[in-house]
C-alpha cells in the first residue's frame, strides 16, 4: 500500500473530508505532500487501493509539549519494566552506546510494579561509575541516581534531606531533594532543542497529528 512516489491517487477509500458539500470521497489525489483534488484522480499518477480503509484529515493537537516530548523519546523508557534487573539491563545497553561522562536519563520506573515493591538501594546504579545516571519515577516526584551524579551536586557524603524533600537509600531523591540533582544536568543547546522538535514531529505524524500548539517552550 505504501509508495515512494510524491504523486499518487488514494482510491477505494472512506475518505472523510469535513466538507459539507462532499463529506465523503472515494478518491483523494496527492501531489508533493499536498491534496491536489477530491474524486478527480490524475491518470498520470500511481493509484493506491485503500481497500475501504478510512482516511481522516490531519489532526491538530491544541495542547502539546513538542520539544519536551522529543526529549522524553530520547530517554530510556522504563514504564513497562517490572524488575530492577530489567532496568539495569536497559541502562547498561544505553551506556554502551554513549561516551563516558554522558548523562543517562530515564523515565517511568515504578517500584510498585516490582516483586518486592521497595525503593532500590544505592549499590544497584553505583555499579556504573563512568556516567551520571538520573532516572525519574513515573509520577515525576522522585529521582533514582548513582554516585557519579551525586558527586557532581552540592550534596556531601552525609546526604541530609532538605526541607520539603527526602533522601532514601542514598540514591532516591524525593520532591525538594531533587532540586540539587536537577541542577547538575547540563543546559540543553539549540541543537538539542532542534533535534527534539524533529524527533517529536516525526512521531506525531505517525499518529496523524500534523499541527500542534505548543503549550510551553523555552526561548531558543
Q: Where would I find each of the regions flagged by the language model?
A:
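Divalent metal-binding segments
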Residues: 6-11, 16, 20-31, 35-37, ...
